[in-house]
Amino acid sequence: LMGIAKEMIAGRLPMVVGTGAIRTEDSITYACAAKNIGADALLIATPPYAYPTGREIALHALAIDREANLPVMLYNYPGRMCVNMDEETLNRLGRSSNFIAIKESSGDPNRLHMLARDYPHIGLSCGMDDQALEFFAWGARSWVCAGSNFAPEAHKALYQTCVLESDFTKGRAIMSAMLPLMRVLEQGGK
């Protein structure tokens, strides 16, 4: 599938490949396969079902980084993985310049503030559709979102308005119109 995706993208956009697996060894295999087909970056989440500590998450991600040596977007989604990529994790990962971004999907505004203030070297990416405006206000430069798959024009308009034009008054109006869709996307049971 990675090869097919790479052909379809044909260099028009960066290709980011997820490496999620229970075992670090399997994540490394996926990451190396991604590198071999020409992926531009990796998406690394916490291993599912394992409930790792911050140290264990960092060791997992650093092992993948050592083998693949590609830019990495971390994926923090404690609502699904039941653990947070905490400060211990982020501090340990700061040892490698490959950890360039984090898709933050905790839903916790305090965590957004902490990431923006304390980890400016890790680019913020919004992972919660209904919090895009807040993320953009705090400096996020990207948004990895489900809704863009079926409402791309509205998502592009919000990004253009907030990130490129810094017009948060207009951005609030766009986001307000999008909120009914966002509520559906962020509700439980998906």
Over which residues does each language-model region extend?
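Catalytic alpha/beta core domains of metabolic enzymes, predominantly
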Residues: R66-E67, P78-G188
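Active-site beta->alpha loop and helix N-cap motifs at the rims of alpha/beta catalytic domains
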Residues: L1-C82, R92
